[in-house]
């Protein structure tokens, strides 16, 4: 029997973590985007082997010497606040950040870093959470209202961790 009456666990505050500390904490668990890799559904091409190397601290043989891959993959982090602000402006909902890692209380190896939560202005409790994304206008995984499968897996993982039933995705399409 599945227990659906649980309170999500705040695993650790990330407010004062460096990027390196945050990355090290992520290595100790399986997150939403990791789950998509494990299922073979990552549209960025990350492999299970790369995930294994990352989780075990093994450096890749081929490095990203010029940092191009890092810039592309981290652009979402750089633009996350702007995406959340646009979401709030367009919906009238308040997007707010809780700088923490959340852990599933029944499966402590599953953790999530939630981009934002959202609520009605003037209210205290969240309605759900917001996943902030950025992509190229040429990304064929986004067609119409279809959300890329790996994002669906990521969001499903977070819904389970948080014991919530609502999530919104806000995506900024960047021209190339």
Where does each model-flagged region fall?
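Basic, amphipathic N-terminal segments that precede the first structured/catalytic domain
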Residues: 79-90
């Amino acid at each position: 029997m599945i227990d659906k009456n649980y309170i999500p666990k705040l695993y650790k505050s990330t407010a004062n973590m460096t990027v390196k500390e945050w990355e090290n904490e992520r290595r100790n668990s399986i997150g939403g985007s990791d789950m998509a890799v494990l299922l073979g559904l990552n549209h960025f091409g990350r492999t299970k082997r790369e995930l294994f190397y990352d989780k075990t601290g093994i450096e890749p043989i081929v490095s990203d010497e010029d940092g191009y891959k890092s810039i592309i993959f981290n652009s979402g982090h750089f633009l996350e606040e702007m995406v959340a602000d646009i979401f709030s402006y367009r919906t009238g909902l308040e997007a707010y950040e809780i700088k923490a890692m959340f852990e599933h209380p029944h499966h402590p190896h599953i953790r999530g870093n939630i981009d934002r939560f959202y609520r009605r202005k003037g209210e205290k409790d969240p309605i759900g959470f917001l996943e902030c994304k950025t992509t190229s206008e040429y990304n064929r995984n986004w067609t119409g209202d279809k959300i890329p499968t790996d994002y669906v897996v990521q969001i499903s993982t977070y819904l389970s961790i948080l014991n919530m039933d609502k999530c919104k995705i806000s995506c900024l399409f960047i021209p190339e």
